[in-house]
Amino acid sequence: MEDKNITVDKIVEICEGRLLSRGTVSTINAFCVDTRKINAKDMFVSLKSEKGEEIQHIKEALQKGAIGCITEKDVPEEIINKYKDRNIIKVKDIICSIQKLAIYKRKMYDIPVVAITGSVGKTSTKDIIANVLKQKFNVAKTEGNYNNHIGVPITILNWKENINAAVVEMGMNHLGEISVLTNIAKPTIAVITNIGTAHIGLLGSRENILKAKLEILEGLSKGGKIIINNDNDMLQNCDTKEYEKITYGIKNKSNYMAYDIERKDNCSEYKIKMDDKEEKIVVPQTGEHFIYNSLCAIAVGKTTGIKTNKIIEGIKTFKITEKRNETKEVNDLKIINDYYNASYDSMKAALEVLKNMKGNRKIAVLGDMLELGDYSENLHKKVGEEVAKNKIDILCTIGDLSKNIAKEAIKLGTKEVYQFKTNEECINKLKEVIKKKDCILLKASNRMNFGEISNYLQGENLWEEQN
């Protein structure tokens, strides 16, 4: 097997860096940007710190056994002398350096690379596609939220020698960002899940969001395929240049279409024609958006030559990433943890999942949606419409922006609505109102810290604390 690890000398060459100290280990097989997660023998990538703590982070990484660090900072002599057995490399631009290294690493692999973007559903689509690909390939996939100008290069730099397929998630909130990522990852298959309203305040319009997402084509390999959601109004007739377009959907005629859909308490089932034969698909999550995600995975599976029975198995057994539409049954409650991010489209999808759950009352705890700019008030009101439409029994909102969700829901007939400024206030109200067998949705942007509410609901003494 060809050695795909990067040497210290190659890092210095590619990054046009300066070797301040040469360590005893000259080959790097893992890169890390977080001192809390660093392992012995990792190369620490020292990113700029808002608090100016780069040197402290370098010391911490080296203390934990990192084989070296790459940094823009002047490293004090005392650190260099103390860690003479480590590789310390100084570069002019840390972001540019890791991106150049990732481009170099990517060229070592002649494998299927699936790049995924879209306004919502990127992570769950990534998870289900990766699980389908695992039925045939040894797969690397984006972990956590490593989907930006730092995360994508680090993801590629950490590809193991033995992988033969990869799934790379690409996020953005400005024009030009996907262009950079796709030219690093050089996908063979591009996926666009949908064009919604996430980051519309920064991009100005859905047309600009579409333009930003279509940048994914700029790095797509010659002969590559683009897979799109044909039920999305913005994607239906989009220009995919010279690339073959493969479509999936439920409503509009597509290459891969779901029909005879059945929604159950803990899964969805549907039928689909593959290779002129009718097949039954079981998706281990509820909600229409998961049906779309699975259709996308089928398209990827077929494009990469995976057998039908293996595709079906990959969909049936996939697991969702924590905090993203993660359903837990605990303390005689059903809790949907979906508080990594929030947009109108993802709120709408989550409320649909809540509506279809079997249980006692349906309780939605919703927080502010961010980065919506001038569209914020209207889109929060539209979420309020969805609350009323889905007949949610109890609505709790937290934050100034989400007051518009509450107002619209009340206006349209939702009877029990509470508005709060803090998570603590909300928890105190939940102590009063929740009952056994209730279904509770927690949905907000990550910075709203809804993990506090989730932890309370999952606490060992929950019912003893009830007022």
Where do the model's predicted regions map?
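ATP-dependent carboxylate-amine ligase
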Residues: M1-G17, A40-M43, E53, T188, ...
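N-terminal leader/targeting and accessory segments in enzymes
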Residues: M1-S97, M257-Y259, T286, M357, ...
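Phosphate-binding loop of NTP-binding sites
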Residues: D9-E13, C96-K225, N230, M234-Y243, ...
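Short glycine/threonine-rich catalytic loop with a Thr-x-Gly-x-Asp
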Residues: C32-V33, D265-S268, Q285-C296, E322-N325, ...
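Beta-strand->loop->alpha-helix junctions that form or flank phosphate-binding loops
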Residues: C69-K73, K92, E242-D265, V282-E288, ...
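Short secondary-structure boundary segments
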Residues: E72-D74, N194, N230, G399, ...
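Short beta-strands and strand-loop turn motifs
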Residues: I111-V114, V191-T197, N229, S294, ...
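Acidic-glycine-rich active-site phosphate/pyrophosphate-binding loop
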Residues: T125-I129, E262-E278, R324-T327
